[in-house]
Swiss-Prot record:
It comes from Caenorhabditis briggsae. Residues 39-54, 123-138, 207-234, 292-326 are cytoplasmic. The chain crosses the membrane at residues 18-38, 55-75, 102-122, 139-159, 186-206, 235-255, 271-291. The lineage of its organism: Eukaryota, Metazoa, Ecdysozoa, Nematoda, Chromadorea. This is Serpentine receptor class alpha-12. GO terms for cellular component: membrane. Keywords: Membrane, Transmembrane, Transmembrane helix.
């Protein structure tokens, strides 16, 4: 067992760390409760395709996995402040002992990124083959989710491959100093991947709007393109939220590390923990899904109401058809 240095010992009991632990506890509980509510709503009959539901539930699983692993940090802060009696030695965690926690943590981050890729791929294929994909129901989502699970679970093993983990750290939710450069590269790739998701989904939205306007008299095709358009917009909003969180994290960490020499150690560590943005992305996922479901339902009700309320004569209908045909 290794004991914390004087600065590290101060961090365990510092008011900023206690406040941060309380905030992370709230985020942890909010993520779990929000995810349960989102899953209940997703399981109800909605206009969202079954495959998209499967992938969104998968995204919630990865978000909760990340939060469960990351909660080990505030839990240790509370434990050190409430039950630790030997103030002369605050124990540090061995990176070898922390492998299970860090594996789940990396799985949560990777899973959320790769789920965005799976959602983008599914929306792209649904745009190209709308009728075929509407008949396959949940099968594409199950296959894509399985393809996401394996690399997500192995991501930390790849990051720490051929590197000896023989150091100690304050929390198991921290990356080992021996793999910090690889971890930074990995998170940068996650940010680039999220940008690609936004671009792909924006292109899919433009494509579906174009196709929808061209097939106004093909009721089935127009309906399929309309559903794909609405679902793709929802996925794009989720990708933007992920991007903002990863941008805050990668940009903030890069700024802090470049100016680390000019910042006292105690202040540096107390500030940089707030820049760790994945918990913000995780807690925002369920509210975004719930809002998207509510918005889709509201839009559908408005369309149905406009059709049922609007009254027109046969002459008005023929006149509209003549105008639309040019």
């Amino acid at each position: 067992m290794s004991c914390a240095s004087e600065v590290q010992a101060q961090l365990f009991t510092h008011p900023v760390q206690i406040i941060y632990a309380c905030v992370q506890t709230v985020l942890f509980l909010a993520t779990i409760i929000g995810s349960l509510l989102a899953i209940v709503q997703l399981c109800k009959k909605t206009t969202i395709p079954d495959s998209t539901k499967v992938l969104l539930i998968g995204a919630l699983f990865f978000a909760n996995a990340h939060e469960l692993a990351y909660f080990s940090s505030p839990f240790k802060v509370f434990k050190m402040n409430l039950f630790h009696t030997n103030t002369s030695c605050y124990p540090l965690a061995s990176t070898l002992e922390c492998i299970p926690t860090t594996t789940v943590l990396a799985m949560g981050i990777s899973g959320n990124m790769l789920i965005q890729s799976a959602l983008s791929i599914f929306r792209l294929l649904a745009t190209i083959f709308p009728v075929c994909y509407s008949r396959m129901r949940a099968l594409p989502g199950v296959v894509l989710l399985f393809m996401v699970l394996i690399p997500s679970f192995l991501s930390y093993s790849w990051i720490r491959s051929d590197i000896v983990l023989d150091d100690y750290q304050m929390f198991c939710s921290q990356w080992s100093a021996n793999i910090s450069s690889r971890a930074n590269t990995y998170l940068e790739y996650c940010s680039y991947l999220t940008v690609a998701h936004i671009i792909i989904n924006a292109l899919i939205i433009l494509r579906n709007r174009s196709v929808e306007s061209k097939c106004r008299f093909d009721v089935q095709q127009r309906y399929l393109n309309s559903e794909t358009l609405k679902t793709t917009q929802t996925i794009c909003y989720l990708s933007i939220a992920q991007f903002l969180a990863m941008f805050l994290y990668s940009g903030g960490v890069l700024f802090m590390r470049k100016n680390q020499k000019n910042i006292p150690t105690l202040i540096y560590i107390n500030v940089i923990v707030w820049v760790y943005a994945p918990p913000y992305a995780c807690v925002s996922l369920a509210p975004l899904i719930l809002f998207s479901l509510w918005n889709l339902k509201k839009q559908r009700q408005i369309r149905i109401q406009s059709i049922t309320v609007q009254k027109e004569t046969q002459e008005d209908h023929i006149r509209k058809l003549q105008l639309s045909w040019g």
